[in-house]
């Protein structure tokens, strides 16, 4: 008697763009053969707002409030990159104290970014409790941001060409140290709950594995790259701001799967705490902004006693011109390498302003690592990438 063969027709299923596990308005057109993923096509662009064209029609300081809407989970990374580009092109130095303040804000953003990744990722794989814990810690970071910038999450508008908008208020550094002392044991609490949990490990170990060469060839960055055995961190490589003043290590793993990406982000939060503690202890005195970018006159060539040269605006001067030239500048955000290609033509607005989003590049590998996976694993693999669609679509 011949054995009966069961044949299934491929089925096309749409995930998103309104499903909560999509982490924004992302749509996945998935082709299934039973429970197995045969193909996946990400459909992006639902949150496109023309950020690059807006930048090309705004002065450098006018564009800063826009950028935190791109990565609305940790917007100060984009604030930093859009002021770093004109600073380097115009050769404007940043005072040491301002650089330390920037590092404090960026590392708080990194922790907040990883926390907001951790909660939904664990909820996607079935662990609901930590989702509520992460907002307890983020609330303390919100309080620190509110005290320093006036805003709690987005539109902090704190970074300026040549420094920051204002100095830290009295007692802020002590509050930041209190947060570091309080948050360290909370990371241990997460690890006790999650890291060696046998159910969690069986659920995600081996899922979405990416080899070292694959990660490099797909231009991955951030935790996606470091979890695949490449200890590449722009804070160490490019030596920007004052990261060389601190003692910290690059977090990386070799396995390249969802579990390795989780371990990298947990360790990155520990390293961010180390940097925060050192920055609070070592921060120097001095100014928090370079006034040269705020003078109405064009640089040091104008008469020193002239009215325009002596007048210093509260913000970057509206006559600040981006010099002729072009450059690409980058930094390490919580999701990976974000960068700006800036082309100036001696005008107050840039000729070209190209934004490189880390999560857009990281998302491109999703169809490759989903093929052969089970339909139930789609959310776990997508969640491990950490995408924010405001940044992907721009």
From Swiss-Prot:
<dbReference type="GO" id="GO:0051287">
    <property type="term" value="F:NAD binding"/>
</dbReference>
<dbReference type="GO" id="GO:0019684">
    <property type="term" value="P:photosynthesis, light reaction"/>
</dbReference>
<dbReference type="Pfam" id="PF00346">
    <property type="entry name" value="Complex1_49kDa"/>
</dbReference>
<keyword id="KW-0618">Plastoquinone</keyword>
<keyword id="KW-0793">Thylakoid</keyword>
<comment type="subunit">
    <text>NDH-1 can be composed of about 15 different subunits; different subcomplexes with different compositions have been identified which probably have different functions.</text>
</comment>
<keyword id="KW-0472">Membrane</keyword>
<dbReference type="GO" id="GO:0048038">
    <property type="term" value="F:quinone binding"/>
</dbReference>
<comment type="function">
    <text>NDH-1 shuttles electrons from an unknown electron donor, via FMN and iron-sulfur (Fe-S) centers, to quinones in the respiratory and/or the photosynthetic chain. The immediate electron acceptor for the enzyme in this species is believed to be plastoquinone. Couples the redox reaction to proton translocation, and thus conserves the redox energy in a proton gradient. Cyanobacterial NDH-1 also plays a role in inorganic carbon-concentration.</text>
</comment>
<protein>
    <recommendedName>
        <fullName>NAD(P)H-quinone oxidoreductase subunit H</fullName>
        <ecNumber>7.1.1.-</ecNumber>
    </recommendedName>
</protein>
<keyword id="KW-0520">NAD</keyword>
<dbReference type="InterPro" id="IPR022885">
    <property type="entry name" value="NDH1_su_D/H"/>
</dbReference>
<dbReference type="InterPro" id="IPR029014">
    <property type="entry name" value="NiFe-Hase_large"/>
</dbReference>
<dbReference type="GO" id="GO:0031676">
    <property type="term" value="C:plasma membrane-derived thylakoid membrane"/>
</dbReference>
<keyword id="KW-0521">NADP</keyword>
<dbReference type="InterPro" id="IPR001135">
    <property type="entry name" value="NADH_Q_OxRdtase_suD"/>
</dbReference>
<keyword id="KW-0813">Transport</keyword>
<dbReference type="GO" id="GO:0016655">
    <property type="term" value="F:oxidoreductase activity, acting on NAD(P)H, quinone or similar compound as acceptor"/>
</dbReference>
<dbReference type="InterPro" id="IPR014029">
    <property type="entry name" value="NADH_UbQ_OxRdtase_49kDa_CS"/>
</dbReference>
<comment type="similarity">
    <text>Belongs to the complex I 49 kDa subunit family.</text>
</comment>
<keyword id="KW-0874">Quinone</keyword>
<keyword id="KW-1278">Translocase</keyword>
């Amino acid at each position: 008697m011949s054995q009966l063969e069961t044949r299934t027709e491929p089925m096309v299923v749409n995930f998103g763009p309104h499903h909560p596990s999509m982490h924004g308005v992302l749509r996945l057109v998935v082709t299934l053969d039973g429970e197995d993923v045969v193909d996946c096509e990400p459909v992006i662009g639902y949150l496109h707002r023309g950020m690059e064209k807006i930048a090309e029609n705004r002065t450098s300081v006018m564009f800063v409030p826009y950028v935190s809407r791109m990565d609305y989970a940790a917007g100060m990374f984009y604030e930093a990159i859009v002021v770093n580009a004109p600073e380097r092109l115009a050769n404007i130095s940043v005072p040491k104290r301002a650089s330390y303040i920037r590092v404090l804000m960026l590392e708080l953003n990194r922790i907040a970014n990883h926390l907001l990744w951790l909660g939904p990722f664990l909820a996607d794989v079935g662990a609901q409790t930590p989702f509520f814990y992460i907002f307890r810690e983020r609330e303390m970071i919100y309080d620190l941001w509110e005290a320093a910038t006036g805003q709690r999450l987005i539109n902090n508008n704190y970074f300026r060409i040549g420094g920051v908008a204002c100095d830290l208020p009295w007692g802020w550094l002590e509050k930041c140290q209190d947060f570091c002392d309080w948050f360290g044991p909370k990371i241990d609490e997460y690890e006790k709950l999650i890291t060696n949990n046998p159910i969690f490990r069986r659920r995600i170990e081996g899922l979405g594995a990416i080899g070292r060469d694959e990660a490099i060839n797909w231009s991955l960055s951030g935790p996606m790259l470091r979890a695949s055995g490449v200890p590449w961190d722009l804070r160490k490589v490019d030596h920007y701001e004052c990261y060389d003043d601190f003692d910290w290590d690059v977090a990386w793993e070799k396995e390249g799967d969802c579990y390795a990406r989780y371990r990298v982000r947990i360790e990155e939060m520990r390293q961010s705490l180390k940097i925060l503690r050192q920055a609070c202890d070592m921060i120097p005195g001095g100014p928090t902004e370079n006034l040269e970018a705020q003078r109405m006159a064009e640089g040091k060539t104008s008469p020193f006693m002239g009215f325009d040269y002596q007048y210093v605006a509260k913000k970057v001067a509206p006559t600040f011109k981006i010099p002729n030239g072009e450059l690409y500048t980058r930094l390490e955000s919580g999701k990976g390498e974000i960068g700006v290609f800036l082309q100036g033509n001696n005008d107050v607005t840039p000729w070209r302003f190209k934004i490189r989003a880390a999560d857009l590049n990281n998302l491109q590998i999703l169809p490759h690592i989903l093929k052969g996976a089970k339909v139930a694993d789609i959310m776990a693999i997508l969640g491990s990438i950490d995408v924010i669609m405001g940044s992907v679509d721009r």
